[in-house]
């Protein structure tokens, strides 16, 4: 069993504070996106698999440290669970690699907006494979998500036209990586849902197995597909890039921990709304820290993406309060 340790000591007022847990969750999410973007934006960076391996290694070591302190409990690695969970690892590696590649080529606001499309794929995947349903309000949020993505693309194209040379292609390969990422992310979530029932994993079990099983896969792919020459390693593994990778790996654990913390001290309803509202500061961080397009269409797409997240969160809450099955939309 994996679980969070509840602090009953002198700092219990902090451990049981809703606003602090929400703030910690939002800060961790922003930090992870910003540090990942910083690394992949470094001049000549081309070792995404190594970056992901370092992050996974940091996650595993931090989990062991938290278990030593008594703040996390998770199952030890065993052959049966590893065999059952390994198919998930393949989807995970595909998901995080395509995520890093899309973030490398797309601005943070556009990346954040397009990630919403994964929600649509997951929702209809649940309709197809688990007998779920899509309500009218959820469908409305999906339409807003698609609209925000279209507007974001137009804003990006508008910005490219101003900076690109005459006759240069305006196609951004980041959109291809984003499309693959949405598909692989949805597949990862849907397959993991089935496997969790098989293994009965909890949050920290899932994080531990995801990271420790992905490490050899990431390292093998790096050796096969990336340049391990001394010159390239020196260029990619600078002090700044490695520091950012370590911070990113630590924030991944923080996000998982803060998610459970937020649900414990507030409610699942509050947490789902925070997740929707959190899209805005993540998108804005791209405008503040990086050279993201700053035209009307780009700003408007952020607003639409933010609105779609709120509508979706409210729709999910209403669905939980009124669990009668509605007719599946196919």
UniProtKB/Swiss-Prot annotation:
Coiled-coil annotated spans: none
One record GO biological process: transmembrane transport
Parts of the chain that traverse the membrane: 14-34, 49-69, 82-98, 105-124, 139-155, 171-191, 204-224, 242-262, 270-290, 295-315
Membrane topology, from the record: Multi-pass membrane protein
Main location: Golgi
Swiss-Prot/TrEMBL keywords: Cytoplasmic vesicle, Endoplasmic reticulum, Golgi apparatus, Membrane, Sugar transport, Transmembrane, Transmembrane helix, Transport
Pfam families: UAA
Membrane topology (Lumenal): 35-48, 99-104, 156-170, 225-241, 291-294
Membrane side Cytoplasmic: residue ranges: 1-13, 70-81, 125-138, 192-203, 263-269, 316-330
Annotated GO CC locations: cytoplasmic vesicle membrane; endoplasmic reticulum membrane; Golgi membrane
Compartment(s) of residence: Golgi apparatus membrane; Cytoplasmic vesicle membrane; Endoplasmic reticulum membrane
Keyword Magnesium: no
Family: Belongs to the TPT transporter family. SLC35D subfamily.
Oligomeric form and interacting partners: Homooligomer.
Purpose: Involved in the import of GDP-mannose from the cytoplasm into the Golgi lumen.
Name of the protein this chain belongs to: GDP-mannose transporter
């Amino acid at each position: 069993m994996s679980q969070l340790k509840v602090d009953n000591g002198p700092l219990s007022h902090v451990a049981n504070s809703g606003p602090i847990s929400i703030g910690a969750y939002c800060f961790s999410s922003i930090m992870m996106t910003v540090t990942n973007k910083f690394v992949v934006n470094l001049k000549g960076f081309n070792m995404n698999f190594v970056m992901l391996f370092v992050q996974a290694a940091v996650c595993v070591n931090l989990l062991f440290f938290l278990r030593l302190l008594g703040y996390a409990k998770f199952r030890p690695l065993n052959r049966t669970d590893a065999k059952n969970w390994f198919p998930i690892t393949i989807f995970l590696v595909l998901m995080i690699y395509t995520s890093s590649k899309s973030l490398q080529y797309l601005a943070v606001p556009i990346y954040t907006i397009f990630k919403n499309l994964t929600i649509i794929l997951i929702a209809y995947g649940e309709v197809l494979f688990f007998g779920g349903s899509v309500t009218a309000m959820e469908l409305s949020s999906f339409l807003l998500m698609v609209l925000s993505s279209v507007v974001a693309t137009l804003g990006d194209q508008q910005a490219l036209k101003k900076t690109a040379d005459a006759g240069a292609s305006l196609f951004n390969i980041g959109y291809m990586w984003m499309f693959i990422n949405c598909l692989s992310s949805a597949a990862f979530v849907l397959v993991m849902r089935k496997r969790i029932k098989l293994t009965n994993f909890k949050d920290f079990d899932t994080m531990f197995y995801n990271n420790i099983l992905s490490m050899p896969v990431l390292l093998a792919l790096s050796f096969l597909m990336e340049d391990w020459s001394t010159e390239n390693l020196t260029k990619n593994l600078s002090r700044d890039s490695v520091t950012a990778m370590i911070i990113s790996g630590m924030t991944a654990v923080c996000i998982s921990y803060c998610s459970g913390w937020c649900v414990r001290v507030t409610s699942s309803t509050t947490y789902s709304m925070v997740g929707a509202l959190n899209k805005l500061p993540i998108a804005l961080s791209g405008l503040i820290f990086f050279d993201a397009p700053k035209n009307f269409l780009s700003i408007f797409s952020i607003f639409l993406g933010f609105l779609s997240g709120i509508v979706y969160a409210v729709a999910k809450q209403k669905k939980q309060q009124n669990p009668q099955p509605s007719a599946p939309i196919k």
